[in-house]
Design a protein with these regions (language model features):
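N-terminal amphipathic/basic-hydrophobic helices that include classical n-h-c signal peptides
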Residues: 1-28
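N-terminal beta1-alpha1-beta2 submodule of the flavodoxin-like/Rossmannoid cofactor-binding fold
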Residues: 22-130, 192-226
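Gly/Ser/Thr-rich helix-start
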Residues: 42, 100, 104, 110, ...
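Mobile beta-alpha loop/short-helix "lid" or hinge segments that flank ligand
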Residues: 67-72, 164-196
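Alpha-helix boundary/capping detector
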Residues: 120-123, 127, 144, 162, ...
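Short, glycine-/small-residue-rich phosphate/pyrophosphate-handling segment
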Residues: 132-182
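Glycine-rich phosphate-binding loop at the start of an alpha helix
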Residues: 154, 186, 203
Length: 226
C-alpha cells in the first residue's frame, strides 16, 4: 500500500506539484541546498567544500545558506539579516531544493540550537511532503577527535528521515575515508579543529566534504531526470 509520502512524491514527479528549476545558459540545473550553522568558521569552511563538490557534478548547482543564531533570552533568531556571509535560509529555499546538505558544530553530541530551531519550524513542509524522495547528507566539526561527531551527524539525520528524504553517506571506497587521521566518517563529512580558532581542513577532510557534495548532487540529478 502506498504511503502518504509515496503519494506526494508521485504527485511531484507527475507534475501535480511542479518543482521550480534554476535556468542557466546551459539549461535547467538541479539545485542542492547547503544549510549550516558556524561560530568560528570550521563548519562554514566544510560547507564551502561541500558546495565545490556539488558544483563539480554536471547539471547540479549549489545554493549556500546559513541559519540565524538564537539568543539566550528567547527562542527567536537574534538578527533578521546576517551582517556578513550567506543569507539566512528560508522555508521556500528548502521547498525548492532538489537535495539538501546540513551542517552544524557539535553541542554535547547534538546539533547546535540554531539549526535545530530552524528544523523545528519545517512542519508545513512535512505536512505537504515537500522534501520526500529527495537526497540529503550531513556534516559536522568538533574540537577533539572524540568530541561527538557521529552522534551529532545522527541527530541531524533524524528530522531528514521524518521528512522522507534519502540519506547519503560516505562509503569506504572513498580513499580519504580509509586514510584520514582527523575528520571523516561513513555518516558524513567532518573536521577536527583542535585548539586553534582558525579553520584549517586537512586534505582528507576537504576531499571527503567534496565527495559528500558530489554524491548528494549526483543522486539528485538522477532522481530529477528519472
Amino acid at each position: 500500500m502506498a504511503t502518504y509520502f509515496d503519494t506526494q512524491a508521485a504527485r511531484a514527479r507527475s507534475g501535480a506539484m511542479p518543482r521550480l528549476r534554476i535556468a542557466t545558459w546551459e539549461g535547467f540545473m538541479t539545485e542542492i541546498l547547503v544549510v549550516y550553522y558556524s561560530r568560528k568558521g570550521s563548519t562554514a569552511e566544510l560547507a564551502r567544500q561541500v558546495c565545490r563538490g556539488i558544483d563539480s557534478v554536471p547539471g547540479a548547482v549549489a545554493k549556500l545558506r546559513t541559519v540565524a543564531p538564537v539568543t539566550a533570552e528567547s527562542e527567536g533568531p537574534a538578527k533578521p539579516v546576517p551582517s556578513s556571509g550567506p543569507p539566512y535560509v528560508t522555508l521556500e529555499d528548502l521547498r525548492r531544493a532538489d537535495g539538501l546538505v546540513l551542517g552544524s558544530p557539535t553541542r554535547f553530541g547534538n546539533m547546535a540550537a540554531p539549526l535545530k530551531y530552524f528544523l523545528d519550524c519545517t512542519s508545513s513542509l512535512w505536512v505537504s511532503g515537500a522534501l520526500a524522495g529527495k537526497p540529503a547528507g550531513v556534516f559536522t566539526s568538533t574540537q577533539t577527535l572524540h568530541g561527538g561527531q557521529e552522534s551529532t551527524l545522527l541527530s541531524m539525520m533524524l528530522p531528514l528521515l521524518h521528512h522522507g528524504m534519502y540519506l547519503v553517506g560516505l562509503p569506504y571506497t572513498e580513499r580519504a575515508l580509509n586514510e584520514t587521521r582527523g575528520g571523516g566518517t561513513p555518516y558524513g563529512a567532518s573536521h577536527v579543529s583542535g585548539p586553534s580558532d582558525e579553520p584549517s581542513l586537512s586534505d582528507h577532510e576537504r576531499a571527503l566534504a567534496q565527495a559528500l557534495g558530489r554524491r548528494v548532487a549526483a543522486l539528485a540529478v538522477r532522481l530529477v531526470e528519472a
